[in-house]
Regions:
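Metal-dependent catalytic neighborhoods of phosphoester/phosphodiester hydrolases
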Residues: 40-61, 76-91, 156-158, 191-196
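His/acidic metal-ligating clusters that form di-metal
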Residues: 25-38, 119-199, 236-237
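Active-site-proximal beta-strand elements of phosphoester/diester hydrolases
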Residues: 1-8, 100-114, 144-146, 198-204, ...
C-alpha cells in the first residue's frame, strides 16, 4: 500500500477522510489469508505529526503481519526515522528475507535545502542508497525493491516529480537478473509494467487516488486501493484491490 496521507486527529484533506480510508484498508487486509508481509511505499503521514505514525503503528500492530515502511515526501524524516520509535512497523534502513525473497527498502526523499523540516516533491536516491541496494543485490536472492518515487513515467500529467536519477537506478537493476519487482507510490495511480526482467508496479493511494487521464489533481473517486502481490516460484501476480469509496 502507499500514500495513506494521515493527518493529526483524522482531519479531512482534499475533502477526503483519509483516516477512514486507512481503516478500511486494514479491515480488507484483516479479511485476507496467508499474508506474509505488508509494505508501505511512503507518505504514511500528510503532516509529519507523531500522532499519525502512532495511529498507523497501532492499526498495523492489530493485524500482527510484519510491516515495512519507507518514507515519502510528505513524511517527516526527523519524526519517522529519528524521534518516533514504532513498536511494530519497521523503517529504514531495512532489508529482510521473506520466504527466500530479499525485500530492499530505499529512501528516495530529498529534504528542502532552505527548510530541512520540509521535503521536495521529486525524488532522488543518494549514492549511499544505491550502494546499499547493490550490496544487497550482490547477495543473490530474488529481490523486491521498494521506494516512494516512480522510476518509470506513468503517462499523462503524472509524468512529473518522479525519481530524478531514475536512469541510474534502472541501469543498475538491469544488470542484476535477481531483481524481479520494483514497487512504489507517489502518483496515487495503479500501474503494472514488465520491462525486461523487472516488473514495475505502483499502488493506487489509500488516501485519495488520481488518474493520468483526468485533469491534473482531480480526485479519482472510488479508485483508492491496495495491491495484493502473490509470488509462486518466479511467477508474480499483482491484483489492485479497490477500497470502494465513491462520492454521492
Amino acid at each position: 500500500m502507499s500514500d495513506l496521507h494521515l493527518t493529526r486527529g483524522g482531519c479531512p484533506i482534499w475533502e477526503t477522510n483519509t483516516m477512514e480510508h486507512f481503516n478500511r484498508s486494514i479491515d480488507v487486509i484483516r479479511g485476507m489469508k496467508d499474508i506474509d508481509a505488508i509494505v508501505v511505499t511512503g507518505d504514511i503521514s500528510n503532516d509529519g505529526s507523531e500522532w499519525t505514525y502512532k495511529y498507523a503503528d497501532r492499526l498495523f500492530s492489530s493485524l500482527g503481519i510484519p510491516t515495512f515502511c519507507c518514507p515519502g515526501n510528505h513524511d517527516s524524516l526527523k519524526v519517522m526515522l529519528e524521534e518516533y520509535n514504532p513498536s511494530f512497523f519497521k523503517v529504514l534502513p531495512q532489508s529482510c528475507i521473506i520466504d527466500g525473497w530479499n525485500l530492499i527498502l530505499l529512501n528516495s526523499v530529498i529534504q528542502d535545502d532552505e527548510d530541512p523540516n520540509q521535503n521536495k516533491a521529486r525524488g532522488f536516491l543518494s549514492e549511499a542508497s544505491l550502494n546499499y541496494m547493490i550490496q544487497k543485490l550482490e547477495e543473490g536472492f530474488p529481490s523486491i525493491i521498494a521506494l516512494h518515487h516512480p522510476p518509470l513515467e506513468p503517462g499523462g500529467w503524472l509524468n512529473r516529480k518522479l525519481l530524478d536519477n531514475r536512469d541510474d537506478f534502472n541501469k543498475i537493476i538491469s544488470l542484476y537478473d535477481n531483481v524481479k519487482l520494483v514497487i512504489y507510490g507517489h502518483i496515487h495511480y495503479f500501474t503494472n509494467v514488465l520491462k525486461g526482467h523487472v516488473r514495475y508496479c505502483s499502488s493506487s493511494s489509500v488516501g485519495f487516488a488520481f488518474d493520468k487521464d483526468l485533469p491534473k489533481f482531480q480526485i479519482a473517486d472510488g479508485y483508492e486501493g491496495i495491491n495484493l502481490i502473490e509470488i509462486i516460484n518466479d511467477s508474480i501476480t499483482i491484483n489492485n484491490i479497490q477500497l470502494s469509496f465513491r462520492s454521492n
